[in-house]
Amino acid sequence: MPNTPEVLIVGAGPTGLTLANELARRNVPFRLIESAPGPQPGSRGKGIQPRTLEVFDDLGIVDRVLANGRIAMPMRSTGLDGTVTLGGAEPESLRNRPDIPYTTSLITPEWRVEEALRQRLAELGGSVEFGTTLVDFTQSDESVAATLDSGGSRATVTASWLVGSDGGHSVVRKQSGITFEGETRDELRMIVADLAVDGLDRDAWHMWRHAEGAVSLCPLPSTDVFQYQGSILPGQDADLSLANLQSILEQRTGRTDIRLHEPEWSTLWRANIRLADRYRVGRVFLAGDAAHIHSPAGGQGMNTGIQDAHNLGWKLAAVVNGASPTLLDTYEAERRPVAAGVLELSNARLADTVANKGMSTQRDASTIQLNVGYRGSSLARDDRDETAMLRAGDRAPDATGLVTADGERRLFDLTRGGRFTLLSFGKAPMIGADESRIRMLSVVAGPAAGPVPSRIDAGDIVDSEGTIASAYDATDNTLVLIRPDGYIGVISDSGETAAVSDYLDAMR
């Protein structure tokens, strides 16, 4: 492995792997180290939210992830009085939306997500250095020097940038002197385990409410096991043995016909709710659980970390290739407020779960992360009124029924791959952009752009169903610059090409 990578990534969970993929597909030299001797077992965070599925679509792994999971898994909850409530359906407000390709969460084990990310990384020429630990590091104005230990052998690596995606106990965060603000609530504990189950069907996520707390069994797609979750009261035995798990299950369900097998993996979760006061110190960054940890209620943690990496990756690559380093200041400015909002949401969900002795079976739009955006960021520029539904900084919506030279496509099919995309309604503008950095798409026909032409050229779009004009609230002059991470950088309804040119010039 090179001793002078541009980026050293510490921690090869979902966040670190996503960042490595972002760099690899842009040909940025990196090293990805992981202290564990091999891939981590355990389902852990098992819920993939729709916005994260869009990230995986962009990275080229969504089909693999979907193949090993289940969308909108039914939920069956037995109440304190024995009443059974069914839920888990796709939110009504999100059904048949051409701007949203994935409308509800996917259940899949976290190790399957890591597996798909490692496979894609290998296809891009990258790999994980397992059994390699960060000992310490120092930084200067020009670089970071890190001491690594691999099997007792130490070496110094010099990198331009260091990213700590090494979890809640992050060595990178601690050695950077970054405060991890928040609290540990020892009274809120939960046993989590992966195990085989007899006497229970796999057609739903089963939950039971009880005065002493909830217990649940969720079938894990693409495996033969369930994820067991059982809350533990203060002072209650938190033994991870099969006998204790079986005892808790029988006491809270009143059923002795459900038989658990020896856990393949288990852990005791405690409520740690914390947020780093900074995401960056000089040439060192934090991402994922190293920067924020919270309750699993609402299924936000892994998703937020993956989206941290999706935000940081293209910016690091741009700076490595000559963009101003000030671009990297926008990482904390954009992502830390998102994490703060996630903590607020997950805390509210946790309080509801504790109060009601179990979590809700109703899915809604609050957790799917499609409303996450960066309005007000220095990377968000538009000439629209503040009351406009779509503004710069928002997630770029999808659209269906687009006729191109290659047949019918979704918009996300055309924007995939991690480049800027300039979407114009009407005649394509002349901005002199490098086509290796920006993709040019022009809506040349449809409700907002006139009659269908007899010939469709490369890059031209016929908006046959009017979905793209509607999603972007476009006129025949509108220009939309979509960032590499799928958020809107510029909207100009007046068709001002200077706004786009100035924006792109700042990235050079």
List PLM regions with ranges.
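A conserved short coil-to-beta-strand element within the FAD-binding core of flavoproteins
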Residues: 130-144
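Glycine-rich FAD pyrophosphate-binding loop
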Residues: 24-45
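FAD/FMN-dependent oxidoreductases across multiple families
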Residues: 68, 239-300, 304, 338, ...
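Helical substrate-recognition/capping region of FAD-dependent monooxygenase/halogenase enzymes
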Residues: 2-6, 10, 25-26, 35, ...
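Core beta-strand elements of the Rossmann-like FAD/NAD(P) dinucleotide-binding domain
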Residues: 3-5, 152-161
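N-terminal Rossmann-fold NAD(P) dinucleotide-binding loop
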Residues: 16-17
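Active-site-adjacent segment of FAD-dependent monooxygenases/related oxidoreductases
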Residues: 41-44, 48-116, 120-122
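Conserved FAD-binding catalytic core of PHBH/FMO-like flavoproteins
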Residues: 119, 161, 165-271
